[in-house]
Amino acid sequence: MRPATLRQCFGVCIGAVLISSCSTGGQTVDSADSEAGARWTNCVVSGAIEGRQIRIVSTVAPITSLIAQVVGESGAEVTGLVPEGTNSHTFEPPPSAAQVLEAADVVFMNGLVLEEPTRDLAESNVGDDTVLCELGTSILPPEKWIFDFSFPRDGGKPNPHLWTNPPMAASYVDVIRDVVSQLDPGNADDYAANAEELLRIIGELDSAMK
């Protein structure tokens, strides 16, 4: 497959992969040692959901698309809170999002201080057993956070756009697969197969870009 075709395929699979026209503010990073921070980083599943399809809530469009590719046609409900093309750095969730978050079995966010208003709303509305998972924060420890011209270190916010990096996007897929498989073990084989195919595409794209 030619590189151009690979890029197109990967774009279809994960949505607007290269959306990065965002600006940053001066908010400081929350402590990763806090109890709430650990919950988001560890992505702990307390038990499987029985008797119904799992309910998944996510934030930015690229992450929502990755999740949709992994769950496939399992029947899992996937709701993305941030409309495609929206500046996720300035997005404020509407009041109606509280009800969506309250019903969620898992909330996937990017993390890395990207969606703080949505994170705050989630923490105020989700149940004790809801899985809270910041994909970026879970795979990239603070000492490896990336700061650059648009995201200076003194601003306190790292560059959160890890999904534009194929190996890191692959790590997102691994975490998503593991979490939804624990929540819905009856569809775990399908989730694994879907993730394997997506990882294959990501790997081919990575090779073509080198």
Sequence positions of predicted segments:
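Extracytoplasmic metal-acquisition and chelation regions
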Residues: 11, 22-210
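Bacterial N-terminal signal peptides that target proteins for export
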Residues: 1-12
